[in-house]
Regions:
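A short acidic, Gly/Pro-enriched loop at the edge of an enzyme's catalytic core
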Residues: 93-104
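Class I SAM-dependent methyltransferase SAM/SAH-binding core
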Residues: 44, 50-94
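Short alpha-helix
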Residues: 160-176
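A short glycine-rich, Lys/Arg-flanked "PGG" loop and its adjoining helix->strand segment in the class I
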Residues: 118-133
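Short, glycine-/aromatic-enriched active-site segment of Class I SAM-dependent methyltransferases
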Residues: 11, 15, 139-159
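Conserved Class I S-adenosyl-L-methionine
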Residues: 181-245
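Conserved alpha-helix/loop element of class I SAM-dependent methyltransferases that forms part
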Residues: 21-39
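A short SAM/SAH-binding and catalytic strip from SAM-dependent methyltransferases
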Residues: 104-116
Length: 245
């Protein structure tokens, strides 16, 4: 089946705005303030999309961040929105940066999109300075065994990669990350779903529009698989252990 990048669909930005995720900037703000990030720190936005968080950080904290994303369409919008920022085309499993390049890495509803999460986590660890911070906001499955049915879906969305939180925590700690915060934020996902239903009439209609191409798996089937997993949303803040390895 032909894959469909739901993030390039107009209906996604219509309902989520430029952030393309639940909660807008609420968790971005919380992560930045918890980690005491300042304008002196080097920041990477992993899966920057249209550059929403990079613009937010600059406008509210005078912070300059680097963004990386595989979508040239979204990067084009990002460069228009934030002309002074640096944006690169790429994926998380091969970050084009030297070791110890950043103090803070953001992955806001993007880690679930990575083709190889294990390799991406190793790359994040590599480019982070010792003691550097890794902030993740993303979707997870309360019934992770059901999530395997989504992996082969051609609909490119974070929902395709719902996390198993226990596995994610183990992967991070095995790499020498210390998990400082793990907070359930499923209310933000519910809030977004209510907004979608109000605007589109149902989640089925929304996913059918987001899937777009007729050669894609129908949004209705995709939504049925999502419901079986009982999705939630979380904030996790980790720190690279300077004594690891």
């Amino acid at each position: 089946l032909e894959s469909c990048n739901a993030y390039e669909s107009r209906c996604m930005s219509d309902v989520m705005g430029c952030t393309l995720r639940p909660g807008e900037f609420r968790l971005t703000k919380k992560a930045v303030e918890f980690c005491h990030i300042t304008s002196e720190h080097k920041i990477l936005d992993l899966g920057c999309g249209m550059g929403a968080s990079i613009g937010f950080l600059y406008q509210n904290y005078n912070m300059k961040a680097v963004g990386i994303d595989p979508s040239e369409k979204l990067l084009g919008i990002a460069r228009e929105n934030c002309p002074s920022a640096r944006f690169l085309s790429g994926t998380g499993d091969f970050l084009p940066f030297e070791n110890d390049s950043f103090d803070f890495v953001l992955a806001e509803c993007t880690l679930s999109l990575m083709n190889d999460i294990g390799k991406t986590l190793r790359e994040v660890r590599r480019v982070l300075n010792n003691g550097g911070w890794f902030a993740i906001t993303d979707v997870y499955a309360k019934k992770p065994d059901e999530a395997e049915t989504l992996r082969s879906s051609p609909v490119v969305s974070c929902m395709r990669g719902l996390h198993d939180l226990e596995k994610l925590q183990k992967n991070l700690t095995d790499l020498g990350f210390h998990i400082c915060i793990l907070e359930d934020c499923s209310d933000l996902l519910k809030e977004l779903m209510v907004k979608i239903i109000f605007q589109f009439g149902s989640m089925d209609v929304f996913w059918n529009k987001a899937a777009g191409s007729q050669t894609c798996e129908t949004g209705t089937l995709f939504h049925q698989k999502i419901k079986q997993c009982k999705p939630g949303y979380f904030l996790m803040i980790c720190r690279k252990d300077e004594y690891y390895g």
